Amino acid sequence: SFPTRRSSDLELLLGQRPPRFDSSFDEAIALTGDDFERVALKAESARDYFLLVGPPGTGKTSRALRRMVEHFYAASSMQILLLAYTNRAVDEICQSLSSITPCIDYIRVGSELSCDVRFRGHLLENILAECNSRREVNIRMADCRVYVGTVASIAAKAELFKLKRFDVAIVDEATQILEPQLLGILCAKFADERNAVGKFILIGDHKQLPAVILQNSGHSEVHDEGLREAGLFNLKDSLFERLYRFHLKEESPKAIDMLCRQGRMHPGVAFFPNKAFYAGKLEALGLPHQLEHIEAPGRFIARNSVV
């Protein structure tokens, strides 16, 4: 897939040039006190890509992805592609889309067997069955600005990129997706030979949901010096993780952000993962179940310096 990209895009994916951002968003980003508004504005300001780290219970799909879609959809001509690794996550994305008002029209690419019954009316095959001519098909597909599917489903419909060019692709569960699985989509070409995907947003958590690889790390290790210079050390790593490592070196990286307020775990339960994996950045939302008194084994762990 790499050779199909322009040289500047190839340099971007290999970490040889930094991603670009629209500085006109900087003031709004600095002033907002809403975490989801902040990351949506950052995603909107990105010209190439943006990475969002979403620890457990921080609302990365139900709130952050939804807010991004609302922002992009408000721009009347924006074409949006929404991807995830599993059909269950795609169901969650569809649920988020269904909660947006006014209602957003979307088409889901995939099988009826792997789609929640609530969203089967949006399946591409069911929508096309209602069309009486190729012209109707083209009009229906052109008029819909939001497409949703698993990475595998979209990759299997390569002809979609001859009909549609997407201004942005938002990828949920991005840390579960290996680079070869994703690059075929990100490097696809539109009919006029422009990139079929203008920019991409990766949402995930490499501390929580890495890709599932059967090989051990030794067998998948990369030894080529050129690839290692590009940050590709192991074939089990996702594109998200490789790009994330690049930006960790920066003092205030524009290309990454992290949701820190979580509403799932009790502080006592969150104590260990917070310290061990998230540098103590996680904060409880203070929901009723998070305020209940429980014995906190994390205190014992802390005193004995296991962390």
Which residues are covered by each model-predicted region?
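Intrinsic disorder
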Residues: 30, 46, 55-58, 62, ...
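Short, small-residue-biased leader/transition segments that mark boundaries at the very start
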Residues: 2-7
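Generic hydrophobic/aromatic pocket-lining and core-packing "Φ" positions
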Residues: 40, 68-69, 182-183
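N-terminal pre-P-loop "Q-motif" helix
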Residues: 28-48, 55, 63, 149
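Short hydrophobic/aromatic beta-strand immediately N-terminal to the Walker A/P-loop
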Residues: 50-53, 81
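Conserved helicase motor core of SF1/SF2 NTP-dependent helicases
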Residues: 74-78, 86, 152-153, 160, ...
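Walker A/P-loop NTP-binding motif
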Residues: 61-76, 92-98, 187-191
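Conserved P-loop NTPase motor core of helicases/translocases
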Residues: 9, 15-17, 21-26, 77-169, ...
